From Swiss-Prot:
GO terms for cellular component: plasma membrane. It comes from Ehrlichia ruminantium (strain Gardel). Belongs to the complex I 49 kDa subunit family. This is NADH-quinone oxidoreductase subunit D. NDH-1 shuttles electrons from NADH, via FMN and iron-sulfur (Fe-S) centers, to quinones in the respiratory chain. The immediate electron acceptor for the enzyme in this species is believed to be ubiquinone. Couples the redox reaction to proton translocation (for every two electrons transferred, four hydrogen ions are translocated across the cytoplasmic membrane), and thus conserves the redox energy in a proton gradient. Pfam families: Complex1_49kDa (PF00346). Keywords: Cell inner membrane, Cell membrane, Membrane, NAD, Quinone, Translocase, Transport, Ubiquinone. PANTHER family: NADH DEHYDROGENASE [UBIQUINONE] IRON-SULFUR PROTEIN 2, MITOCHONDRIAL, NADH-UBIQUINONE OXIDOREDUCTASE 49 KDA SUBUNIT. The gene is nuoD. It catalyses: a quinone + NADH + 5 H(+)(in) = a quinol + NAD(+) + 4 H(+)(out). It is found in: Cell inner membrane. Its main location: membrane.
Amino acid sequence: MSDHVKITPMTLNFGPQHPAAHGVMRLVLEMGGEVIERIDPHIGLLHRGTEKLIEYKTYLQALPYFDRLDYVSPMAQEHAYSLCVEKLLKCEVPIRAKYLRVIFCELTRILNHLLNISSQALDIGAMTPLLWMFEEREKILNFYERASGARFHSAYIRPGGVAADIPEDLIHDIFQFVNTFPKFMDDVDSLLTENRIWKQRNVDIGVVSKKQALNWGFSGPMLRACGIPWDLRKSQPYEIYDELEFKIPIGEKGDCYDRYLVRMAEIRESISLVEQCLNRIPDGPVKTDDRKIAPPKRSEMKKSMEALIHHFKLYSEGYIVPAGETYMAVEAPKGEFGVYIVSDGTNKPYRCRIRAPGFAHLQAIDMMAKGHMLADLTAIIGSLDIVFGEIDR
């Protein structure tokens, strides 16, 4: 009898109903025993035709679609779209609105990373971080609700500014949150960072070199974990980021553990950014004074018939955007989220193209997981931080 047993390759379906699939991901795996030889990701199970739907909506009506792309960090998407429309309109945003945008975008980054780290830990088998982190996420979602009226799909950041100003007591509560939050992060650090099992499951798993990361179009924490200090908030500053002080956390190896460390460090940097904004935020309007874009105040509408007509026209017909095309990208929690709009001089976009960071990261899963064990795949997927709303669009 031969000592060598021939292992026949096996095809395995991972998802789309798998708890570690982070949504509706389907992977077709070619296995050589317990080792992954090839991965074929199947996308499109959450395709809703967002880009096409936007062509039939006015510029303001198109905004809520962006909340529903990466539904874990909604305000970052609204921000990219609003900046893009403002660039076409050549519209100036009040300074207080810029500060509010940065505050909520950085809270969104914390919201996103808390979910990612907790779900990555849960996939590997650590349950405590999920319970702890969801308690903190709830506080941020509460801030969302107090600012916009909605916990998730807020439609708060709009072309021309933000939907409404926030009350003084909300600023006070956010301040209290950022003062107590670093202590919570220290607790999470003590739970995971030097944990023996956590390190065994993440160190040297899914290693990506600098060259590979650039070739695959990585951005965000996925790129920075490879040692490339690329952050749009520093390299192509928008809003008031050039006035704020923050570091760009980078990794060394580009493995799952480095990606975790980068996200942990980014949470701390975001806390610092929110604190700086709260200390500096000036008084003033939160919407542009261009009445062709911003609706009149409620108090004005109660007195003036013209204001009421204006409000109705603005929300039914929308505003005309000058013909042209532009691309605008923001440093979303998952990477570079870009919006490309072509305007034909009407009240609806002629074409809107969305550049989702998760799409590029999912493409590289075959390269990252090849040669690893099946059990390591959950750690790799967790570290990718993918949400199918933005990948399938």
